[in-house]
Amino acid sequence: VAALLPLVGRFHEFSVATPDIRACVEFYEQLGFTQAATGDALSHPYGVLSDGRLHLGLHQHSAPTPTLTFVRPGVGSAVPAYAAAGIELTVCRTGEDVFNEIGFSDPFGQAVTVLEARTYSPPARTATEVSLLGDFAQVSLPAADFAAAQAFWEPLGFVAADEAQEPYAHLPLTSDTLDIAFHQPRTFERPMLVFRSAAMAARVARLGELGVEMLPLPRGIRADGNALLEAPDGTALLLLQGEN
C-alpha cells in the first residue's frame, strides 16, 4: 500500500511550535475547534485542535515552525525514494526501536515532516461542523518563484492548476488530502491558513464581537468581507469571502 501513496503520504497536521499550548487551545476553541486525543509517540507536550477538515498540531518544543506534517507507513524504507527525487533530508530518524520520522525543506524554506504513524485520534466531528472561520480551503505558502515551487512539490504528490490572480496572485496545487497554494512574499511574507465562506462578512463581524483582533490584510486583498487574524502561536489565518 505504501508504494501506492504519494511520496509524502497523507496530510496529517499543520504543526506549530508554541511555548503556551493552553493559550492556543483557548483561542482555537473560542473559534469553534475541537480538541483531539493525542497518543504517546511524542516526548514533548503536544495538543491537537480540529475543525473537522484541518488538524492543528501544537508542539511545546523547539523546531521549525510552521511545519507541514504527513504520515507515510514504512517511511524508513522510503528514504531511498526521497534521495532519488533529489530531496536532501534534514531529519532522518528511522529504525525498529524509534518512532520513524524524516524531515526536509522546500526551496523556500518551508519545513516538511513525514511520520510513520498518526500521533492523534481525530475527534468525532464531521466536515459540515464548520468553525467560526468558515471552510478550510488551503495552506498558502510564500514562494518567490512559482515554477520552482511547482517543480519541487509535484513529485511529492501535488498537481498544479492555472495561476490565479484573485483574490491575490497565487498558484494553487491540489492533492487527495491537502490543497496548497503559493503566493509572492511581497503579498505576505509568511504562510497562511486560508478559509472561505459565502457569508464571511457576517463571520468576521461575529469574530469582532468576540474581541478577536484583526490584522492588516495582505497586500492587494480588498476588505470586502475578508480579514486576517493571528493566533497566539503566530499562525496567520486568512478569511476570504466566497465559496471554496
Where are these regions (language model features)?
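N-terminal beta-strand motif that seeds the catalytic metal site of vicinal oxygen chelate
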Residues: 1-22, 66-68, 115-150, 156, ...
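A short beta-turn/loop motif at secondary-structure boundaries
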Residues: 40-41, 62, 94-96, 185-187, ...
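Core segments of cupin and vicinal oxygen chelate
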Residues: 3-11, 15-55, 140-178
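A short linear hydrophobic-aromatic micro-motif
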Residues: 35-37, 56-57, 88-92, 180-181, ...
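Vicinal oxygen chelate
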Residues: 2-5, 10-19, 47-48, 60-135, 141, 163-165, ...
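Short loop/beta submotifs within extracellular cysteine-rich repeat domains
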Residues: 35-36, 56-58, 78, 160-162, ...
